[in-house]
């Protein structure tokens, strides 16, 4: 079993998906599997979120990294494994940070560590969860809300005790896309 399963939803953003894949290929430790969920129809954010609940993990940990996001920490897997191997029990959740461009680094310092950041102040790529934790909470992706990512995040952070907050900025977003496809000039 791979250490990390990276789950990427994609809809008509080939350049973003290519950048996403390249960022994973640059990892110093290639102990990951990349699951890509393709939307050929434009089903919308709510339905795309709901599809995440169908993911049956094949990695020890699961990380959602959409096609407009990419990993900026080439040692992410190596560093996560180092922490996991040095703890008595594997963490249920790693919380990391992301560069959300115009929104800045999320979660921001004022909302960091120990509590659930408010809706809009954290993104799905901030959580890396153990496979059993994914299975336990994945139905929260089906709330039918545009912000079901926050529903999932809140359920996980409110329900788990063994959460490791890492002040690492590990991903970036190309632009605030609100689910729109790329437009090429």
PLM region spans:
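Short beta-strand-to-loop acidic/aromatic patch adjacent to the donor-nucleotide binding site
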Residues: 59-70
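A recurrent flexible, glycine/aromatic-enriched loop bordering the glycosyltransferase active site
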Residues: 109-128
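Active-site donor/metal-binding and catalytic loop motifs
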Residues: 100-101, 125-126, 166-185
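Short beta-strand-to-loop element that shapes/binds the nucleotide-sugar donor at the catalytic cleft/hinge
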Residues: 94-106
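Acidic donor-binding/catalytic loop of UDP-sugar-dependent glycosyltransferases
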Residues: 69-83
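Acidic donor-binding loop at a coil-to-helix junction in glycosyltransferase catalytic cores
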Residues: 144-152
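Short, acidic, metal-binding catalytic loop of nucleotide-sugar glycosyltransferases
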Residues: 10, 19-32
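Active-site nucleotide-sugar/metal-binding loop of Leloir-type enzymes
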Residues: 50-61
């Amino acid at each position: 079993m791979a250490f990390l399963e990276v789950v990427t939803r994609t809809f008509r953003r080939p350049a973003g998906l290519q950048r996403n894949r390249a960022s994973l290929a640059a990892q110093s430790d290639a102990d990951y599997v990349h699951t890509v969920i393709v939307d050929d129809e434009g089903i919308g954010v709510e339905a795309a979120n709901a599809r995440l609940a169908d993911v049956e993990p094949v990695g020890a940990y699961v990380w959602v990294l959409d096609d407009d996001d990419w990993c900026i920490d080439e040692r992410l897997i190596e560093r996560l494994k180092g922490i996991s191997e040095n703890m008595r029990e594997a963490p249920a959740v790693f919380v990391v940070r992301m560069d959300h461009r115009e929104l800045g680094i999320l979660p921001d310092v004022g909302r960091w560590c120990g509590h659930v950041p408010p809706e809009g102040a954290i993104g799905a790529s901030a959580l890396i969860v153990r496979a059993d934790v994914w299975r336990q909470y994945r139905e929260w992706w089906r709330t039918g809300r545009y912000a079901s990512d926050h529903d999932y995040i809140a359920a996980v952070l409110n329900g788990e005790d063994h959460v490791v907050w890492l002040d690492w900025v590990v991903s970036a977003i190309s632009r605030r896309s609100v689910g729109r496809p790329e437009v090429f000039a």
